[in-house]
Regions:
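Helix-loop-helix hairpin linking two adjacent transmembrane segments in secondary transporters
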Residues: 134-177
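Conserved MFS/SLC helix-loop-helix module at the cytosolic interface between two early adjacent transmembrane helices
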Residues: 55-95
Length: 398
């Protein structure tokens, strides 16, 4: 099968799966508050549990995909996603909510494998565009998923879980019957096999070796900080709409849909145009500046329209920054270590998504609703400084 067809199929698979994930985004905080009667800090823990499991399983799945192939790992993860969503539909306690997020977290650990799949079927020249497809799948999942979730919440929260599971099962079937395996049979297969055999399921030494490379380390660090800054507001964004702006689940769904649509447009095509008129250094500097400013403005937007405008600009910033950094990470990594490196990066990103919601929920409840967003802005300022003064010294960006 042609590489273009493979890209289309992996895009559809990730999109359909993330559509199910997106359905729960606007309703999880309100479900937790209205049905389970838990506070903001507990909501942060529930969100963090999902990411903590991803932190543990991302490198494991990355290494397994290097050895056994991308397709079987993706198939298993999609099935586990469906199971997690079904458990959510029957949730009547906080412990059940945590359990459902843990199962879904294992299933959601396949994104690093999907990124490795993209790396397998693209050249270094068009890899940034390929990575943008994953971002576009995220964006479209965030467009339609939250909209569907907000609308379905009118019929009960259980329905949203069943529909989310249905989407994951569609992606499951699509992957089994149509998605080709992307992992190549290298001429130096012995070397690859040795690399795999040397790695334990959670090989700290392999991670140290990868992060010891200065160019790779700074890229992973930048991605980590950005992910923390964004995860900081992941759960609190819907809480802000619910408790401060007085949004309904449907309005929260619309807001997440606006964010996702912008991200999909940027990563699905606009980033390619932007990449032709400016170099990567300029793209990263402008993006980090926009993210920093808009995060600081979110709690003070005042109205639905004001928040929508700020969110659109924020989505443009993240939509250009993330795939560019992912592309650079892939470019400075050898072919035999694409899976483990991207899996490691995804794992560290998951750890940032553990810390972010924990801090965001705590800050929202005990310090005040602006603080999760202001914290994100402060950390993004660090990204801005590193992008301007440090990153160009380590990596060729022109």
């Amino acid at each position: 099968m042609k590489k273009k067809s493979a890209l289309v199929l992996i895009f559809l698979t990730v999109f359909i799966d993330l559509l199910g994930f997106g359905i729960l985004i606007p309703i999880l905080p309100s479900f937790s508050v209205k049905e389970l009667k838990i506070d903001e800090a507990a909501i942060g823990i529930a969100i963090a549990a999902y990411s903590f499991i991803q932190f543990l399983f991302n490198p494991v799945l990355g290494k397994l995909s290097d050895k056994y192939g991308r397709k079987p790992v993706i198939v298993v993860c999609l099935f586990l996603n469906a199971v997690g969503y079904i458990i959510f539909s029957f949730t009547h306690s906080y412990l059940m909510l945590l359990f459902s997020r843990i199962i879904a977290g294992i299933g959601g650990s396949s994104i690093g494998v999907a990124q490795a799949y993209i790396a397998d079927v693209t050249t270094r020249e068009n890899r940034s565009k390929g990575m943008g497809l994953i971002g576009s799948a995220f964006g479209l999942g965030f467009v339609f998923g939250p909209l569907i979730g907000g609308l379905l919440s009118e019929f009960g929260y259980a329905i949203t879980g069943f529909v989310a599971a249905g989407f994951s099962m569609i992606a499951f079937v699509l992957t089994i019957f149509y998605l080709p395996e992307s992992l190549k049979k290298h001429n130096n297969l012995t070397e690859v096999e040795q690399n795999v055999k040397k790695r334990r399921l959670f090989d700290v030494e392999a991670m140290k070796k990868i992060l010891a490379k200065p160019d790779l380390a700074v890229l992973v660090f930048l991605f980590f900080i950005l992910t923390f800054s964004f995860a900081n507001i992941y759960g609190t964004f819907a809480l802000l709409g619910l408790k401060v702006y007085g949004f309904t689940d449907i309005q929260n769904g619309y807001m997440f849909g606006i964010v996702g649509l912008t991200s999909a447009i940027v990563q699905g095509g606009l980033i390619g145009f932007v990449g032709k008129i400016m170099n990567k250094k300029s793209m990263l500097i402008i993006a980090s500046f926009l993210i920093m400013v808009t995060l600081a403005l979110i709690p003070y937007a005042g109205t639905f329209l004001g928040l929508a405008i700020v969110s659109i600009i924020l989505s443009y910033g993240t939509g250009t920054f993330q795939p560019t950094i992912l592309s650079l990470i892939s470019e400075v990594t050898s072919e035999s270590e694409q899976g483990i490196t991207l899996g490691l990066n995804q794992s560290l990103s998951s750890f940032a998504r553990v810390l972010g919601p924990l801090w965001g929920g705590f800050a929202f409840e005990y310090l005040g609703y602006p603080f999760p967003f202001l914290t994100g802005a402060a950390f993004t300022f660090i990204i801005f400084l590193l992008t301007v003064f440090y990153l160009p010294k380590k990596i060729k960006l022109d």
